[in-house]
Amino acid sequence: MLNPSAYALGANRSCIRDLFEYGCQRAAVVGRENVYDYSLGNPSIPSPKEVDETVRRILDDTDSLLIHGYTSAVGDYATRKAISDDLNARYGVSTVPEEFFIGCGAAPELVSVFRALAVPGAEILAVAPYFPEYKPFAQEAGLEFKVVPADIPSFQINLTAMEQMITPSTQAIILNSPNNPSGVVYTEETLKGLAALLERKSKEYGHPIYIIADEPYRELVYGGVKVPFIPCLYKNTIVCYSYSKSLSLPGERIGYV
């Protein structure tokens, strides 16, 4: 017998996936160069040459049993240390490898985090507009999913609306900056205001309210725009990162929490 709630989550088709399949069909007829695919987030820019060079070097110089074998449950230590060292150098933070878990891209990382926060009756808040898969991820984990309207026309976080929607059952706020689909980058001023609000509400309710920072687009900014690193502004932040966008590697499924 099938789990009815799980079946219900997968019963409705994704229009994004349907568009991707349609694009593949059209490409077979008119040629891929004549199809402009705005469905999935597949890159149109090749991965950096250093990625291919590194893959070749690893294949040539490393024991295949190590390449294709299991790692520790939390991921290879050297990889976690490299990530930690990189973030420390870029953002002036003091992370250690033990704080990181290697994941198969941001989506399963988010699912794991949602499940970890899904105590009975818990809820999670997203800021509109949001990546559509957040909702089924949260519902599958057993979380109530609520949406905070954006501050129009800036699309920054509407802190007044956020405060009205936070309850004692609120476990986390999920943020995506730069945002998919709006492209907005939440400013440091906005994030500091959110941090102050969450610190106050956490103290009021007697438990931490986390920020889940979904950051696959962290490096994809232009015109000198800077993306604030949220852990620098709010202690109870869980970062879910993927190299799918920054290195054009969506098929490799590499990321970290």
Per-range role (PLM):
Residues L2, L9-G105, S112:
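N-terminal small-domain helix-loop-helix segment of the aminotransferase-like
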Residues Y7-A11, P149, S182, S244-S246:
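Glycine-rich "substrate-gating" loop/helix at the edge of Rossmann-like oxidoreductase active sites
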Residues S44-P48, P181-V184, E219-L220, S248-L249:
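Short catalytic/ligand-binding loop motif for oxyanion handling, primarily in non-cytosolic enzymes
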Residues P48-D52, Y222-K226, G251-R253:
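Short aromatic-enriched loop/helix-cap "lid" or pocket-rim segments at secondary-structure transitions
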Residues S64-G206, R218-Y234, I238:
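Conserved core of the PLP fold type I
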Residues I211-I212:
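Residue-level marker for buried hydrophobic side chains located in beta-strands
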Residues E215:
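Walker B catalytic acidic pair
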Residues P231-V257:
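Active-site PLP attachment segment
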